[in-house]
Amino acid sequence: MAQLYFYYSAMNAGKSTSLLQSSYNYRERGMNTLVMTASIDDRYGKGKVASRIGIESDAQVFSSHDNLIEMITAAHQENHLSCVLVDECQFLSKEQVKQLTYIVDKIDIPVLCYGLRTDFQGELFSGSHYLLAWADKLVELKTICHCGRKANMVVRLDGEGKVMREGEQVAIGGNESYESVCRKHFREFIWD
């Protein structure tokens, strides 16, 4: 039976690396996968999933308005899919997460989603909210804070490296813009 997985973490925990490894494992066994990523995140080029350690893969992009059932079933008809892997899944809409449950429940294709749980203010992203509610399996990938504790929060940095407390929920960036921290340090930076 196929299941919907949500692999979540703060930044720099290896989400994209894990996704690429999972896709490779399927393909190594002669199975087809569909790697997808949000069109909003083009840090490594449009239609690319890339890891900080240097591995990458082409990916089909989706926007918040795309119908994932149509996209995935078209790919499945072309290349019998054994697995769908979604990077940057925090950018999925509620309806798209519901569509992924359809892919799992009705078409019987496993879907592995990888993304952030919360934004730089500690608030859930829409995609993460519904994946936490509806996924069959929740898996936390871990990274560490500068103090050595588990980092489960993210802070946004301005151009001078200072923590920002306000701003739009989505601002695409990497290590120059974000830092993963433990809740204790998040509290000091944001809440206190």
From Swiss-Prot:
<dbReference type="Pfam" id="PF00265">
    <property type="entry name" value="TK"/>
</dbReference>
<dbReference type="GO" id="GO:0071897">
    <property type="term" value="P:DNA biosynthetic process"/>
</dbReference>
<keyword id="KW-0808">Transferase</keyword>
<keyword id="KW-0547">Nucleotide-binding</keyword>
<keyword id="KW-0237">DNA synthesis</keyword>
<keyword id="KW-0963">Cytoplasm</keyword>
<dbReference type="GO" id="GO:0005829">
    <property type="term" value="C:cytosol"/>
</dbReference>
<dbReference type="GO" id="GO:0005524">
    <property type="term" value="F:ATP binding"/>
</dbReference>
<keyword id="KW-0067">ATP-binding</keyword>
<dbReference type="GO" id="GO:0008270">
    <property type="term" value="F:zinc ion binding"/>
</dbReference>
<feature type="binding site">
    <location>
        <begin position="87"/>
        <end position="90"/>
    </location>
    <ligand>
        <name>ATP</name>
    </ligand>
</feature>
<feature type="binding site">
    <location>
        <position position="145"/>
    </location>
    <ligand>
        <name>Zn(2+)</name>
    </ligand>
</feature>
<dbReference type="GO" id="GO:0046104">
    <property type="term" value="P:thymidine metabolic process"/>
</dbReference>
<comment type="similarity">
    <text>Belongs to the thymidine kinase family.</text>
</comment>
<dbReference type="InterPro" id="IPR020633">
    <property type="entry name" value="Thymidine_kinase_CS"/>
</dbReference>
<keyword id="KW-0418">Kinase</keyword>
<protein>
    <recommendedName>
        <fullName>Thymidine kinase</fullName>
        <ecNumber>2.7.1.21</ecNumber>
    </recommendedName>
</protein>
<feature type="active site" description="Proton acceptor">
    <location>
        <position position="88"/>
    </location>
</feature>
<feature type="binding site">
    <location>
        <begin position="9"/>
        <end position="16"/>
    </location>
    <ligand>
        <name>ATP</name>
    </ligand>
</feature>
<feature type="binding site">
    <location>
        <position position="185"/>
    </location>
    <ligand>
        <name>Zn(2+)</name>
    </ligand>
</feature>
<feature type="binding site">
    <location>
        <position position="182"/>
    </location>
    <ligand>
        <name>Zn(2+)</name>
    </ligand>
</feature>
<dbReference type="GO" id="GO:0004797">
    <property type="term" value="F:thymidine kinase activity"/>
</dbReference>
<comment type="subunit">
    <text>Homotetramer.</text>
</comment>
<keyword id="KW-0862">Zinc</keyword>
<feature type="binding site">
    <location>
        <position position="147"/>
    </location>
    <ligand>
        <name>Zn(2+)</name>
    </ligand>
</feature>
<dbReference type="InterPro" id="IPR001267">
    <property type="entry name" value="Thymidine_kinase"/>
</dbReference>
<dbReference type="InterPro" id="IPR027417">
    <property type="entry name" value="P-loop_NTPase"/>
</dbReference>
<keyword id="KW-0479">Metal-binding</keyword>
